[in-house]
């Protein structure tokens, strides 16, 4: 009988440790299911600001000292966070905007759209408004851009959503491809680099190739992907996301670093020990030099390798056969490279 209090105390300690561990994990959470978001107070889109402080705490702004958070809801019901990321020792044009982070987060989780967006424009996270012009361009290239709503909220007021189309209309030429649309670039590794295991092996260059096959590069046709490995053996990936306006484009290293920030639970960039870039040989836009500059600066002990790829004509033909839709008028739709 005398042991029961000790057993109860032990169980209470275990419960406390579990709760603390769960809270620590939640601290670095960038993706919320609808139920998880509801537990954070986001029961409908107008309450997206309830997650903004959590987002701002996750921002990495050692240079600008200005932490920005963004919270968005997809049609799946999941809620995503975006944060700004500066890279110590690098010019600010390499930085990632919070809205870019959020859209990349959506892409890495294979979401199809972004329905509602709240971006903090004050350091206290109480005021919400229009994204910067750079990010508006990025957002307008999504397939549902005309239906997307942006929260406008002065301090201590309820706020309301406005249509994105009113902020930046007609930025895409008719027939332009859209961000977040499913893509397969039909790439294969060139030469001896392709002689590795099977398509589902875990080699970092195979993961980088898979990322490159998801890359959105319809204007320069220079798809590329990056895979990273940290000191604990965890891997991350990202791909080049191109904008019709050029400058808002996000490189594959930055996209992979979005994945790293979102899933590494607070690790510093110097914990990245390996990186692989896969891109086309003689691509009109090469990522190699930029990737090396970024990784040499933020992860000086990282082993960086580059492998080249090319379009596999047999895969491309098979892909076209499987995805091409021909309507009764002979028009071709559903084709994305």
Swiss-Prot record:
<feature type="binding site">
    <location>
        <position position="135"/>
    </location>
    <ligand>
        <name>Zn(2+)</name>
    </ligand>
</feature>
<feature type="domain" description="CMP/dCMP-type deaminase 2">
    <location>
        <begin position="199"/>
        <end position="320"/>
    </location>
</feature>
<dbReference type="Pfam" id="PF08211">
    <property type="entry name" value="dCMP_cyt_deam_2"/>
</dbReference>
<dbReference type="GO" id="GO:0008270">
    <property type="term" value="F:zinc ion binding"/>
</dbReference>
<dbReference type="InterPro" id="IPR006263">
    <property type="entry name" value="Cyt_deam_dimer"/>
</dbReference>
<dbReference type="InterPro" id="IPR016192">
    <property type="entry name" value="APOBEC/CMP_deaminase_Zn-bd"/>
</dbReference>
<dbReference type="InterPro" id="IPR002125">
    <property type="entry name" value="CMP_dCMP_dom"/>
</dbReference>
<dbReference type="Pfam" id="PF00383">
    <property type="entry name" value="dCMP_cyt_deam_1"/>
</dbReference>
<keyword id="KW-0479">Metal-binding</keyword>
<dbReference type="InterPro" id="IPR013171">
    <property type="entry name" value="Cyd/dCyd_deaminase_Zn-bd"/>
</dbReference>
<keyword id="KW-0862">Zinc</keyword>
<feature type="active site" description="Proton donor">
    <location>
        <position position="99"/>
    </location>
</feature>
<comment type="subunit">
    <text>Homodimer.</text>
</comment>
<keyword id="KW-0378">Hydrolase</keyword>
<protein>
    <recommendedName>
        <fullName>Cytidine deaminase 2</fullName>
        <ecNumber>3.5.4.5</ecNumber>
    </recommendedName>
</protein>
<comment type="function">
    <text>This enzyme scavenges exogenous and endogenous cytidine and 2'-deoxycytidine for UMP synthesis.</text>
</comment>
<feature type="binding site">
    <location>
        <begin position="84"/>
        <end position="86"/>
    </location>
    <ligand>
        <name>substrate</name>
    </ligand>
</feature>
<dbReference type="GO" id="GO:0005737">
    <property type="term" value="C:cytoplasm"/>
</dbReference>
<feature type="domain" description="CMP/dCMP-type deaminase 1">
    <location>
        <begin position="43"/>
        <end position="164"/>
    </location>
</feature>
<dbReference type="GO" id="GO:0042802">
    <property type="term" value="F:identical protein binding"/>
</dbReference>
<dbReference type="GO" id="GO:0004126">
    <property type="term" value="F:cytidine deaminase activity"/>
</dbReference>
<feature type="binding site">
    <location>
        <position position="132"/>
    </location>
    <ligand>
        <name>Zn(2+)</name>
    </ligand>
</feature>
<comment type="similarity">
    <text>Belongs to the cytidine and deoxycytidylate deaminase family.</text>
</comment>
<dbReference type="InterPro" id="IPR016193">
    <property type="entry name" value="Cytidine_deaminase-like"/>
</dbReference>
<feature type="binding site">
    <location>
        <position position="97"/>
    </location>
    <ligand>
        <name>Zn(2+)</name>
    </ligand>
</feature>
<dbReference type="GO" id="GO:0009972">
    <property type="term" value="P:cytidine deamination"/>
</dbReference>
<dbReference type="InterPro" id="IPR050202">
    <property type="entry name" value="Cyt/Deoxycyt_deaminase"/>
</dbReference>
């Amino acid at each position: 009988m005398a042991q029961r209090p000790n057993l109860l105390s032990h169980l209470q300690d275990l419960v406390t440790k579990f709760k603390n561990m769960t809270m620590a994990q939640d601290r670095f959470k960038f993706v919320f299911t609808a139920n998880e978001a509801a537990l954070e107070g986001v029961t409908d889109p107008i309450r997206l600001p309830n997650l903004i402080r959590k987002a701002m705490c996750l921002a990495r702004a050692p240079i600008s000292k200005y932490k920005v958070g963004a919270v968005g809801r997809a049609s799946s019901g999941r809620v995503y966070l975006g944060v700004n990321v500066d890279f110590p020792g690098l010019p600010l044009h390499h930085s990632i905007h919070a809205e870019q982070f959020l859209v990349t987060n959506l892409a890495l989780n294979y979401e199809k759209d972004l329905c509602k967006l709240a971006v903090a424009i004050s350091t206290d996270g109480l005021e919400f408004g229009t994204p910067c012009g750079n990010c508006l361009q990025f957002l307008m290239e999504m397939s549902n851009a005309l239906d997307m709503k942006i929260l406008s909220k002065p301090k201590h007021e309820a706020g309301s959503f406005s249509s994105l189309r009113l902020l930046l209309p007609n930025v895409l030429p008719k027939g332009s491809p859209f961000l977040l649309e499913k893509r397969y670039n039909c790439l294969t590794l060139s030469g001896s680099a392709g002689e590795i295991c099977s398509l589902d092996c875990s080699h970092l260059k195979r993961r980088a190739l898979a990322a490159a096959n998801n890359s959105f590069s319809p204007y320069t046709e220079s798809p590329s992907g990056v895979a990273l490995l940290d000191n604990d053996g965890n891997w991350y990936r990202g791909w080049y996301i191109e904008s019709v306006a050029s400058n808002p484009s996000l490189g594959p290293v930055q996209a992979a670093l979005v994945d790293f920030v979102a899933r590494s639970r607070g690790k510093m960039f110097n914990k990245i020990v390996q990186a692989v870039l896969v891109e086309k040989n003689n691509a009109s836009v090469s990522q190699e030099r930029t990737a090396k500059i970024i990784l040499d600066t933020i992860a000086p002990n990282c082993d960086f390798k580059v492998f080249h790829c090319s379009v596999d004509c047999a895969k491309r033909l098979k892909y076209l056969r499987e995805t091409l839709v021909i309507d009764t008028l002979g028009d071709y739709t559903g084709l994305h490279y």
